A protein has these predicted regions:
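Mg2+-dependent endonuclease catalytic cores in nucleic-acid-processing enzymes, primarily RNase H-like
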Residues: 1-82, 112-115, 124-139
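Aromatic-residue detector
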Residues: 69, 87, 103-104, 136
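Short, solvent-exposed helix-loop connector elements
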Residues: 81-93
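P-loop NTPase catalytic cores that bind/hydrolyze ATP
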Residues: 92-112
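Hydrophobic helices that insert into or interface with lipid environments
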Residues: 119-120
């Protein structure tokens, strides 16, 4: 999809332009991409770059939240030369609101400019190395 004039494009999201109907702007995003992104952050080991962690040591304090996060599953699907994880609700497990909210919050952070170096535009500074020029190259 090509951006329309006035839109702000981002990583698998775009913010509508200022000329939107009734002056209301919205953010549209690829739900499958971002749910996969959040799931990868949760699977990343605590303390590693890009991990998403939760406060406390007692998992029962987050039982309802984690229940919502397990309310969907993904199926890898191939199309247009790539593989995409397509997320779907689990049967008999309708409550996924907090999973959707967590995903939306991560998208909102991206819209605000927060990024991991592996997916964002932020570059990692490389250490400069001093090298000696060969004798046959004039200095």
């Amino acid at each position: 999809r090509k951006p329309v004039k006035g839109e702000k494009p981002g990583t698998e999201w775009y913010l509508s332009g200022h000329g939107a109907k009734r002056g209301i702007r919205f953010c549209a995003y690829d739900t499958n991409y971002w749910k996969t992104f959040v799931a990868q952050r949760i699977k990343t080991a605590t303390g590693d770059i890009g991990s998403l962690t939760f406060w406390g040591h007692d998992a029962t304090e987050h039982a309802t939240f984690f229940s919502h996060m397990r309310a969907e599953y993904f199926t890898p699907t191939a199309g247009r030369g790539r593989v995409v994880d397509v997320w779907q609700p689990r049967p008999q497990h309708p409550d996924n609101h907090w999973w959707d909210c967590l995903t939306g919050a991560v998208v909102a952070a991206s819209v605000a400019g927060v990024a991991l170096t592996e997916v964002g535009t932020t570059s990692v500074k490389k250490e400069k190395k001093m090298v000696a020029l060969p004798a046959y190259i004039p200095q």
